[in-house]
Each structure stands twice: as structure tokens, then as C-alpha cells.
Amino acid sequence: AKIQQTATFNQGFMTTELVAASILDMNWHDLTSVEGIDVNTFEKEQMAKIGLIEEIIPRYRTTYFNHIFNSGYSAGYYSYLWAEVLDKDAFDLFKEKGIFDPETAKAFRKNILEKGGSDDPMKLYKQFRGAEPNPEAMIKGRGL
């Protein structure tokens, strides 16, 4: 039991810093021009807008947030959280129907695995799950 409890230790902090980094990423990529912008001031203003307290800083500060500037993650850092939402919500269906329920497994295979990127992801997910992903599953999984 104690080992299982460690899985949700400090998740409030970790979730907050991940959300803050995701918002910062989106805000940088929402700009039409960066000319004349002071990086530290911009970051501080963005974190103040969401009410982030000084004790919780974003996972990565702008000056070393390589994910959002040097890779395919531009304006997509949030995808870590979104993937977790999908994971937890999909698994909840398996738990509801039975982990080894053949119909649930078949629906997952036919609507998610077989289709890949061939259609709108939300459409495919809804065909599998019967509804849009529910973030509550992730929140519960994090012990929040």
C-alpha cells in the first residue's frame, strides 16, 4: 500500500508545473512577433496571468526550454498531458467492461490501432469510447 501511495506523491506540484510549461509554450507560439520582447519579463507576465505562485516555476524556463524551440513540439508540449488523459480514460473503459473484455479490445483495435492517423483522432476516439476523453480519469490517476 505504501509503495502504491508513492505513485501520487507530489502530483499537485508536478501537474501544476507541467500545465504552466504547456501554457508558456502556447503563449510563446501565439505571438506574431518577438521583436523587443524581454524573455524573462514575458515569462513572468504569463505565469502571473494564470496565478502561478513563485514557489512553483515552470518545468522548463524559456531560456532552456529546448522542446518548444528545437523540435517537433512547437506549441505542443501539452501533448504529454493529453496523452495521459487519453491513456487513463481509455483504460477506464477496460476497467468498466473487464480488462480482458473481447468487445472492448476489438473496439480499441478497430478504431484506434488499425486506423492510425487515417482519420480525425477525436472521431476515432469517440467511435472507440462512445464519448470524448474525460480528463477526470487523469486527475484521479494522479491522486488529485
Residue ranges and their predicted role:
Residues A1-L144:
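Cation-handling catalytic/transport regions enriched in His/Asp/Glu
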